[in-house]
Amino acid sequence: MENDTWENESSASNHSIDETIVEIPGKYQTMEMIFIATVTGSLSLVTVVGNILVMLSIKVNRQLQTVNNYFLFSLACADLIIGVFSMNLYSLYIIKGYWPLGPIVCDLWLALDYVVSNASVMNLLIISLERXFCVTKPLTYPARRTTKMAGLMIAAAWLLSFELWAPAILFWQFIVGQRTVPSGECYIQFLSNPAVTFGTAIAAFYLPVVIMTILYIHISLASRSRVRRHCPETRQEKKKPISSMKSLLIKQTKNIPKQDAGDKVVEKKNGVSNGKIEKSMTNLQTAEEKETSNESSSASLSHNPPEKQPLSEASSGVVLAPTQSMPPLPAKANTASKWSKIKIVTKQTGNECVTAIEIVPECAIPLPEQANNRPVNVARKFASIARNQVRKKRQMAAREKKVTRTIFAILLAFIITWTPYNVMVLINTFCQTCIPETIWYIGYWLCYVNSTINPACYALCNATFKKTFKHLLMCQYKSIGTAR
């Protein structure tokens, strides 16, 4: 009888415990859980799709296969892992109110989460360092900036992140001899010490942010300096006379046939001989050829002295305007030699650089018609040279501006999304009850949202990425190679 009574009481007690466990209300109501699941699931989906688009764009579009974009590819890999695993597991943890998957999955999730997050920070740091070397050492660093070197740097970032976090997270309980994380909870055991938490926050976030901010300021200043060097003329310098022009002398003799001027031009800074300007440039195109860019240069041919010859300025297009032609003379003038002066000056109109070319014959003795055409041909070639130089300088400036803008957007997004959580970590070190649990969840999730924002940064700051995204989403695969 006593045994029956004890068994009945025991079974009733067990039944009440079971009912208590089952009937414990969750932290959120049903509609709240649906809302949380919808929002977090949508963010996870957008993160996965966006970073897959980034990786596919770099893979299929050769124009995006640059060293700098390989670092973005590595960053997209980290963001993709966060979107697939970290976001969804943390959402499950929030909705359930406890960790339902056991300690092994907990440790694996934490190891993956912290390794990938730290790899993202390391990739951002590498991007900043690599860009700083490009703008501060433009002559020496590009020679070492190879795909192999980029691969080694990316591998180092991932290996270092793995070594810093994975062993400590997975094996700390064996090092100290016990697992102190309660059942139903999931956090890193060695971070239960506030001092350790404070130190890791400084090393993993604040120190990299300070370094990247300093590097970006340095990159921005160096890029602006390089762009200004392409258009060094200031407003005060514009008022200076034409004496600031660069001059080249071309000697014209009767021994040089007309067709030679149109075949090959070899240019040299120091001087000229036999009407050929020496420089490592051959088979130049004439000024009549159509150009796809809007670079500007102008040329004029006149008998006027240099100080009286006006320079034609243009903000776009190429203008080649011989203002005056020289009449032919008797054949005895063929034996005469003439020195012509070609002047090249770069002017700045607003934010644009304009290159003007002026050819001025120094002597008053005119030449026959055959020799008369030679300055025009040379002017055309110099117009083409100047046009190409302006185009290359503008393209380089545009590329630098694009890369710098992309880096700025990525760093800004990183700082905005990661700062709230890391500020709360520091506050929690001194006051463990000051931060509400919901604010913790939001702050931690903001770190994940950074992986969602990064692909948008690439598209907004890089037109090629944007067009490639569009072609991929619309299945216009044949147009991907032409996206510019």
Swiss-Prot record:
Q: Which cysteines are joined by disulfide bonds?
A: C106-C186
Q: Which of UniProt's keywords are assigned here?
A: Cell membrane, Disulfide bond, G-protein coupled receptor, Glycoprotein, Membrane, Phosphoprotein, Postsynaptic cell membrane, Receptor, Synapse, Transducer, Transmembrane, Transmembrane helix
**What is the membrane topology listed in the Swiss-Prot or TrEMBL record?**
Multi-pass membrane protein
SUPFAM superfamilies on file: Family A G protein-coupled receptor-like
GO cellular component, alphabetical, reads:
dendrite; plasma membrane; postsynaptic membrane; synapse
Q: Does the keyword Disulfide bond apply?
A: yes
Protein location: Cell membrane; Postsynaptic cell membrane
Chain ranges passing through the membrane = 33-55, 70-90, 108-129, 150-172, 195-217, 407-427, 442-461
So which domain of life are we looking at? Eukaryota
Q: Which InterPro entries match?
A: GPCR_Rhodpsn, GPCR_Rhodpsn_7TM, Musac_Ach_M4_rcpt, Musac_Ach_rcpt
Topological domain spans for side Cytoplasmic:
56-69, 130-149, 218-406, 462-484
Topology check: give the Extracellular ranges. Answer: 1-32, 91-107, 173-194, 428-441
- Provide ranges: composition bias, Basic and acidic residues: 260-270
GO BP, one example?
A: regulation of locomotion
Kindly list every residue the record annotates as glycosylated: N3, N8, N14
Q: Where is this region: Disordered?
A: 255-316
One annotated GO molecular function: G protein-coupled serotonin receptor activity
**Listed PANTHER family:** 5-HYDROXYTRYPTAMINE RECEPTOR, MUSCARINIC ACETYLCHOLINE RECEPTOR M4
Q: Tell me the protein family, please.
A: Belongs to the G-protein coupled receptor 1 family. Muscarinic acetylcholine receptor subfamily. CHRM4 sub-subfamily.
Q: What does this protein do?
A: The muscarinic acetylcholine receptor mediates various cellular responses, including inhibition of adenylate cyclase, breakdown of phosphoinositides and modulation of potassium channels through the action of G proteins. Primary transducing effect is inhibition of adenylate cyclase.
What name goes with this protein? Muscarinic acetylcholine receptor M4
Q: Which organism is it from?
A: Xenopus laevis
Which gene specifies this protein's sequence? chrm4
